């Protein structure tokens, strides 16, 4: 099974009439078969006690028994989606937002004009860092790119290997200013070394936070924790910082009352960096920022920025984008319904969930093509996943793979009707996405994308062959093929090509296959997906996973041993992904790198607690409601 799942960028695509309305429509025939297993990832047969729901594909001259995943149906009725409405698309809200943007830009500019009461040589660094950190976490930073750069250039001009204090004339460096400065500067591409944190570490791995846990020391530990998650490979001090700060914060949050700081800590410990998403963080930080105990809304001589204006703009921006989300979601729901894909009852239909992820990644309104392309790509991947892993026969999936390789709709007569429809959806989707990409790239990228999908489908064929032969591969065999079948490349490539940044092929290969970035992202999704799905898969008779293959290679090892090994691999991959995102010698435009990186974060979020895609009735349903369906209260 692929941890990513997908469908393309077409609107008026319909499955063949024979599938939708004729007497040859697939009719489900529920049969209990005790000796057959459902295999989605290249698994062996189930034990004799395994019960299975099969669907018989009935035609005049053919009767094929087919396996079904028995997934729950789509949770979001099209009538409900089309009924959504919001007032936040009205011009008056945009006018208010524009006014606030101007006022906040004045706040940034005023920081360069020192005020004896508000901005002094003893607080000028931390004031700038607070301001930048706040607009970024509130999700409004895209409006202040120049102001952010100016503020960080100023901070960096006073940066040194012994850390910084609150201001340029501070006599002693402090952990809070240094940790926040290090994190912010590193994320913006400045050359800062993690060695600066050693200034605050003793020989026992303890950092400069006393056991008394005052509010100031707790905030220092929080910023140390946030900084530690942006680690590169080999940075021992970052490992020490994460261990110390996470333990310190877990103890502290038990002792302090419910307040903005406790909420901030709880969120940081829960989602960290690699299961976080820009829009999710913005929604949470509005609650933290606007809490009655929040220091950001208190007007005093040490707090320069007008927190109320920042919060007001953040809420307006969230709701204005929310109105755009509803329009796009209504389009996606119509597209899904009109395509005929709902007739494929055997497949998972998670277009709404995928739209939620896509809009949590790409929060700039102008990136509509990315959001819609991501949804369609991911949904099509899901349909193909369910065809190749459960519903389709070996003969059918080989025919389909060959049809994709030929790329000619006139040569699909050998396909069963349901596959003809899916093929046409794929064909039209990739064609339309290539047309969208041509607007930004200035060249035809269709053949490039097609090759990526051919390789992806070949990986499914390999897994199907393992199923048919009952072969349990070695860890390395499974992992190398599984990186491709994770579908990261298929899901990420075409949406990224629609971004408004030039990606000539020689640069594109630095983020696409066979780049280190692509290999790491695909590895990450395969490993994380397997750790969340292997028990449910095994219960359905699907044996092959990173866990089972590791245990095969290491006789006598336990599931716990395998999970420890895989989680260790994931931790190292995360650090390498950080480096690939932030490395100073990269020639890949940061918007492309960041969106590719955020796709891994979004999908990691989906697998944080469970397979949140196959089981979308719990945390994923709540995410949809909070991120897409519900505005914030102004």
Curated annotation (Swiss-Prot):
<feature type="transit peptide" description="Chloroplast">
    <location>
        <begin position="1"/>
        <end position="21"/>
    </location>
</feature>
<comment type="pathway">
    <text>Terpene metabolism; oleoresin biosynthesis.</text>
</comment>
<dbReference type="GO" id="GO:0009611">
    <property type="term" value="P:response to wounding"/>
</dbReference>
<comment type="pathway">
    <text>Secondary metabolite biosynthesis; terpenoid biosynthesis.</text>
</comment>
<dbReference type="InterPro" id="IPR005630">
    <property type="entry name" value="Terpene_synthase_metal-bd"/>
</dbReference>
<feature type="short sequence motif" description="DDXXD motif">
    <location>
        <begin position="385"/>
        <end position="389"/>
    </location>
</feature>
<feature type="binding site">
    <location>
        <position position="385"/>
    </location>
    <ligand>
        <name>(2E)-geranyl diphosphate</name>
    </ligand>
</feature>
<dbReference type="InterPro" id="IPR044814">
    <property type="entry name" value="Terpene_cyclase_plant_C1"/>
</dbReference>
<dbReference type="GO" id="GO:0016102">
    <property type="term" value="P:diterpenoid biosynthetic process"/>
</dbReference>
<feature type="binding site">
    <location>
        <position position="389"/>
    </location>
    <ligand>
        <name>Mg(2+) 1</name>
    </ligand>
</feature>
<dbReference type="GO" id="GO:0000287">
    <property type="term" value="F:magnesium ion binding"/>
</dbReference>
<comment type="similarity">
    <text>Belongs to the terpene synthase family. Tpsb subfamily.</text>
</comment>
<dbReference type="GO" id="GO:0043693">
    <property type="term" value="P:monoterpene biosynthetic process"/>
</dbReference>
<dbReference type="InterPro" id="IPR008930">
    <property type="entry name" value="Terpenoid_cyclase/PrenylTrfase"/>
</dbReference>
<feature type="binding site">
    <location>
        <position position="529"/>
    </location>
    <ligand>
        <name>(2E)-geranyl diphosphate</name>
    </ligand>
</feature>
<dbReference type="InterPro" id="IPR008949">
    <property type="entry name" value="Isoprenoid_synthase_dom_sf"/>
</dbReference>
<keyword id="KW-0479">Metal-binding</keyword>
<feature type="binding site">
    <location>
        <position position="385"/>
    </location>
    <ligand>
        <name>Mg(2+) 2</name>
    </ligand>
</feature>
<dbReference type="InterPro" id="IPR050148">
    <property type="entry name" value="Terpene_synthase-like"/>
</dbReference>
<comment type="subunit">
    <text>Monomer.</text>
</comment>
<feature type="binding site">
    <location>
        <position position="529"/>
    </location>
    <ligand>
        <name>Mg(2+) 3</name>
    </ligand>
</feature>
<protein>
    <recommendedName>
        <fullName>(-)-limonene synthase, chloroplastic</fullName>
        <ecNumber>4.2.3.16</ecNumber>
    </recommendedName>
</protein>
<feature type="binding site">
    <location>
        <position position="537"/>
    </location>
    <ligand>
        <name>Mg(2+) 3</name>
    </ligand>
</feature>
<feature type="binding site">
    <location>
        <position position="348"/>
    </location>
    <ligand>
        <name>(2E)-geranyl diphosphate</name>
    </ligand>
</feature>
<dbReference type="InterPro" id="IPR034741">
    <property type="entry name" value="Terpene_cyclase-like_1_C"/>
</dbReference>
<feature type="binding site">
    <location>
        <position position="385"/>
    </location>
    <ligand>
        <name>Mg(2+) 1</name>
    </ligand>
</feature>
<dbReference type="InterPro" id="IPR001906">
    <property type="entry name" value="Terpene_synth_N"/>
</dbReference>
<keyword id="KW-0150">Chloroplast</keyword>
<keyword id="KW-0460">Magnesium</keyword>
<dbReference type="GO" id="GO:0050552">
    <property type="term" value="F:(4S)-limonene synthase activity"/>
</dbReference>
<dbReference type="Pfam" id="PF01397">
    <property type="entry name" value="Terpene_synth"/>
</dbReference>
<comment type="function">
    <text>Monoterpene synthase (mono-TPS) involved in the biosynthesis of monoterpene natural products. Catalyzes the conversion of (2E)-geranyl diphosphate (GPP) into (-)-limonene. Not able to use geranylgeranyl pyrophosphate (GGPP) and farnesyl pyrophosphate (FPP) as substrates.</text>
</comment>
<keyword id="KW-0809">Transit peptide</keyword>
<keyword id="KW-0456">Lyase</keyword>
<dbReference type="Pfam" id="PF03936">
    <property type="entry name" value="Terpene_synth_C"/>
</dbReference>
<dbReference type="GO" id="GO:0009507">
    <property type="term" value="C:chloroplast"/>
</dbReference>
<feature type="binding site">
    <location>
        <position position="389"/>
    </location>
    <ligand>
        <name>Mg(2+) 2</name>
    </ligand>
</feature>
<keyword id="KW-0934">Plastid</keyword>
<feature type="binding site">
    <location>
        <position position="389"/>
    </location>
    <ligand>
        <name>(2E)-geranyl diphosphate</name>
    </ligand>
</feature>
<dbReference type="InterPro" id="IPR036965">
    <property type="entry name" value="Terpene_synth_N_sf"/>
</dbReference>
<dbReference type="GO" id="GO:0046250">
    <property type="term" value="P:limonene biosynthetic process"/>
</dbReference>
<feature type="binding site">
    <location>
        <position position="526"/>
    </location>
    <ligand>
        <name>(2E)-geranyl diphosphate</name>
    </ligand>
</feature>
């Amino acid at each position: 099974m692929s941890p990513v799942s997908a469908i393309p960028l077409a609107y008026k695509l319909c499955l063949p009439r024979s599938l939708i309305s004729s007497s040859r429509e697939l009719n489900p025939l529920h049969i209990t078969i005790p000796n057959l297993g459902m295999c989605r990832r290249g698994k062996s047969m189930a034990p004799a006690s395994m019960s299975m729901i099969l669907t018989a594909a009935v035609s005049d001259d053919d009767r094929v028994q087919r396996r079904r995943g028995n997934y729950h149906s789509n949770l979001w009725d099209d009538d409900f989606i089309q009924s959504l409405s919001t007032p936040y698309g009205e011009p008056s809200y945009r006018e208010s937002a524009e006014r606030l943007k101007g006022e906040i830009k004045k706040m940034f500019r005023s920081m360069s004009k020192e005020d004896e009461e508000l901005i002094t040589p003893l607080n000028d660094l931390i004031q700038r860092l607070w301001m930048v950190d706040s607009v970024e976490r509130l999700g409004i930073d895209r409006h202040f790119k120049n102001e952010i750069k100016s503020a960080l250039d100023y901070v960096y001009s006073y940066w040194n290997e012994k850390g910084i204090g609150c201001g340029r004339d501070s006599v002693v460096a402090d952990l809070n200013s240094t940790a926040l400065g290090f994190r912010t500067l590193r994320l913006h591409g400045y050359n800062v070394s993690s060695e600066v944190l050693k200034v605050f570490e003793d020989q026992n791995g303890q950092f400069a936070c006393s056991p008394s846990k005052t509010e100031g020391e707790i905030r220092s530990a929080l910023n140390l924790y946030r900084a530690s998650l942006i680690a590169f490979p080999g940075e021992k001090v970052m490992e020490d910082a994460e261990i110390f700060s996470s333990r310190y914060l877990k103890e502290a949050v038990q002792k302090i009352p419910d307040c903005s700081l406790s909420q901030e800590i709880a969120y940081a410990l829960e989602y960290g960096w690699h299961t976080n998403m820009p829009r999710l963080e913005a929604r949470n930080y509005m609650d933290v920022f606007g809490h009655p105990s929040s220091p950001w809304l208190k007007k005093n001589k040490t707090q320069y920025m007008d927190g109320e204006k920042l919060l007001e703009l953040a809420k307006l921006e969230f709701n204005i984008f929310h109105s755009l989300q509803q329009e796009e979601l209504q389009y996606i729901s119509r597209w899904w319904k009109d395509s005929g894909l709902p007739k494929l009852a055997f497949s998972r239909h998670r277009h709404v969930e995928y739209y939620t992820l896509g809009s949590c990644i790409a929060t700039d309104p102008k990136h509509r093509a990315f959001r819609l392309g991501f949804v369609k790509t991911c949904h099509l991947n899901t349909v193909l996943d369910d065809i190749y892993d459960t519903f389709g026969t070996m003969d059918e999936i080989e025919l389909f793979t060959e049809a994709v390789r030929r790329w000619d709709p006139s040569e699909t007569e050998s396909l069963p009707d349901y596959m003809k429809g899916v093929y046409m959806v794929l064909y039209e989707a990739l064609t339309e996405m290539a047309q969208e990409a041509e607007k930004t790239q200035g060249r035809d990228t269709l053949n490039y994308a097609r090759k990526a999908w051919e390789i992806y489908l070949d990986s499914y064929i390999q897994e199907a062959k393992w199923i048919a032969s009952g072969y349990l591969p070695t860890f390395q065999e499974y992992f190398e093929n599984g990186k491709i079948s994770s579908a990261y490349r298929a899901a990420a490539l075409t949406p990224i090509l629609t971004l408004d940044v030039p990606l000539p092929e020689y640069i594109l290969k630095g983020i696409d296959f066979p780049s280190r970035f692509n290999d790491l992202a695909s590895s990450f999704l395969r490993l994380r997906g397997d750790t969340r799905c292997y028990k449910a898969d095994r219960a359905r008779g699907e044996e092959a996973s990173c866990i089972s293959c590791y245990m095969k290679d290491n006789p006598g090892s336990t599931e716990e041993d395998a999970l420890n090994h895989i989680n260790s691999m994931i931790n190292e991959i995360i650090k390498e992904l950080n480096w690939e995102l932030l490395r100073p010698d990269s020639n890949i435009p940061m918007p492309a790198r960041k969106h590719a990186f955020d796709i891994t974060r979004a999908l990691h979020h989906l697998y944080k607690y469970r397979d949140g895609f196959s089981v979308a009735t719990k945390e994923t349903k709540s995410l949809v409601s909070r991120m897409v369906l519900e505005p914030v209260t102004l």
